[in-house]
Amino acid sequence: MKRIVVLGAGESGAGAAVLAKVKGFDTFVSDMSAIKDKYKTLLDGHGIAWEEGRHTEEQILSADEVVKSPGIPNDAPLILRLREQGTPIISEIEFAGRYTDAKMICITGSNGKTTTTSLIYHIFKSAGLNVGLAGNIGKSLALQVAEEKHDYYVIELSSFQLDNMYNFRADIAVLMNITPDHLDRYDHCMQNYINAKFRITQNQTSEDAFIFWNDDPIIKRELDKHGIRAHLYPFSAIKEEGSIAYVEDHEVVITEPIAFNMEQEQLALTGQHNLYNSLAAGISANLAGITKEDIRKALSDFQGVEHRLEKVARVRGIDFINDSKATNVNSCWYALQSMTTKTVLILGGKDKGNDYTEIEELVREKCSALVYLGLHNEKLHEFFDRLGLPVAEVQTGMKDAVEAAYKLAKKGETVLLSPCCASFDLFKSYEDRGEQFKKYVREL
């Protein structure tokens, strides 16, 4: 009997283990951290052996194949041992893809992928399609393949997930943009990160679709290097050569495969960055054969994504906005660009090799003060202190950061949490960071 070992027992790992068990494999799960009770219950319910707080090497090195959590680096010692002995290491998405014939709509990019994924799912669901939401958001793809059997899956893919995908094929691949992110996981080499993102197009054929932002200089430069066989669907902010979707005379226009248009002001999502998200989602729905009426309705009634430019409250004339999902500099750039008032910016956390020059001009123009929130703020001091803005440093947690920002902000201004960094120095996740921000804002 083939032995499958799953490393990591979060949403993706637990789901992969259930699918492996359902398919009749000898299955073992190992997590170096504590496993959440809900995943223990799931594993126990399927009779799957597991361990937590350690990796027992003899159990793991005996695997015929390993399904690895995207959070485990490829250069972790145990992963290197497995590679040395020739054990195949794959992602949960790769594993799940073997056991379904459903259409796969896959979205990646440095920014905008969660909003775009959620919007595509909303359009498909609203149109009455049998669709699942998976990847970085929603339920484990493997668990859904084991238990639910959808006709379509809309999947948000990080570069880490793409790294361990080999035969998986996206029917529709969407690449929103590429800006520096996670370079600490890619030997601080931008080309390695770019190559990971373009893996979303591997295995595509001329029957498949590749949707991408035509204004992204890196994507345009790299297109010819990757032997893309899929039909190309480029989109841009304005009508330009090659683009099949754009805005013209305040109308969203999609020219292929079926002509589509709607008034830009009817879009539920506002701001330039959200225009790109809406264009990519509109093309995806168009390719899936969803009616123009259903696409228009869903693009106009979408509710947005939590922790992404989420309006929290107005306290004594000061607006508070939660953009905790901004874990890189480019995300913060989009957030600052959308600000219409002077802004107190809360930033900081686990730096991933950030270059803050990208937001320097916007910080000068838009910000009235800065709050550094993190255990190690030396890089922020080094870059931003010279701008001469009032600065508060907080190393204790979100409560003190919110109070510091509130004191610095004036009536009519905005406090924006848009950290540019990962959350893992003081918080469990970007969701935890955002929830704490909202909690302490409401306690002001």
UniProtKB/Swiss-Prot annotation:
SUPFAM superfamilies, A to Z: MurCD N-terminal domain (SSF51984), MurD-like peptide ligases, catalytic domain (SSF53623), MurD-like peptide ligases, peptide-binding domain (SSF53244)
Disulphide connectivity of cysteines: none
BP GO terms, sorted: cell division; cell wall organization; peptidoglycan biosynthetic process; regulation of cell shape
ATP-binding recorded as keyword: yes
Gene Ontology terms: cellular component: cytoplasm
Residues where ATP binds: 109-115
Primary localization class, coarse: cytoplasm
Keywords, alphabetical: ATP-binding, Cell cycle, Cell division, Cell shape, Cell wall biogenesis/degradation, Cytoplasm, Ligase, Nucleotide-binding, Peptidoglycan synthesis
Physiological role: Cell wall formation. Catalyzes the addition of glutamate to the nucleotide precursor UDP-N-acetylmuramoyl-L-alanine (UMA).
Family of this protein: Belongs to the MurCDEF family.
Protein name: UDP-N-acetylmuramoylalanine--D-glutamate ligase
Source species: Bacteroides fragilis (strain ATCC 25285 / DSM 2151 / CCUG 4856 / JCM 11019 / LMG 10263 / NCTC 9343 / Onslow / VPI 2553 / EN-2)
